[in-house]
Amino acid sequence: MSLSTPLITDSTIQAATWLKNGQLLAYPTESVWGIGCDPFNKQAVMRLLDIKQRPIEKGMIVVTDSPSRITALLEGLTAVERQTVLDSWQADSINATAKQAHTWLLPIPKNLPITIPSWITGAHDSVAVRVIDHPLVKQLCAQMVSVSNPYGFVVSTSCNPSGKPPALSLIEAQSYFLGDNVNSDECVGYLKGETLGYQLPSQIGDALTGQVIR
């Protein structure tokens, strides 16, 4: 498929190829639709920041499929801090209406083999990471693993233009970023699926202090 033609697929392999080619992708998450890109592609991140009208200083959230991908990032935590983070990412039998996605600000070790780029961390010395619950996005993250992205990271921000509510469905996501609603050089693809129906908004916490940021 031409990169000038929007991708609409249920294949995580096609979606990962789209991301690796520097494109933006909308996809379902736990509670709302997200939009993201390859975090190690600066041009893609800058385009995403532009359509979201988001200052680079704020930093971006990245998601991955498993804590095992980010072992090096967890080494800066105490055993108690690490367990708190890991416990928040464990799937359980709680009803979706009571579930909440958890993102953690993790300190970046100086000896990290593949460092996290400044256009992802923004003005911070930490990176916002979530092990995502959504099975489809887990598959996508696994497809993103490479020498340059050993963490399987995908940028994750809410799928909406500035001032609009986050999309809750594929149709709503397309209404924001398909066709005339987005510039041709900012072509957005779509990974078809449904959210997990989480009713609580996602939470961001500082792994070192336990402070809830959002």
UniProtKB/Swiss-Prot annotation:
Protein name: Threonylcarbamoyl-AMP synthase
GO biological process, one term: tRNA threonylcarbamoyladenosine modification
UniProt domain YrdC-like: residue ranges: 9-214
Subcellular location: Cytoplasm
Function per UniProt: Required for the formation of a threonylcarbamoyl group on adenosine at position 37 (t(6)A37) in tRNAs that read codons beginning with adenine. Catalyzes the conversion of L-threonine, HCO(3)(-)/CO(2) and ATP to give threonylcarbamoyl-AMP (TC-AMP) as the acyladenylate intermediate, with the release of diphosphate.
Its EC number(s): 2.7.7.87
Keywords attached to this entry: ATP-binding, Cytoplasm, Nucleotide-binding, Nucleotidyltransferase, Transferase, tRNA processing
A cellular-component GO term for this protein: cytoplasm
Catalytic activity: L-threonine + hydrogencarbonate + ATP = L-threonylcarbamoyladenylate + diphosphate + H2O
Primary location group: cytoplasm
Organism: Psychrobacter cryohalolentis (strain ATCC BAA-1226 / DSM 17306 / VKM B-2378 / K5)
Species lineage: Bacteria, Pseudomonadati, Pseudomonadota, Gammaproteobacteria, Moraxellales
Family indicated by similarity: Belongs to the SUA5 family. TsaC subfamily.
Gene Ontology MF terms in the entry: ATP binding; double-stranded RNA binding; L-threonylcarbamoyladenylate synthase; tRNA binding
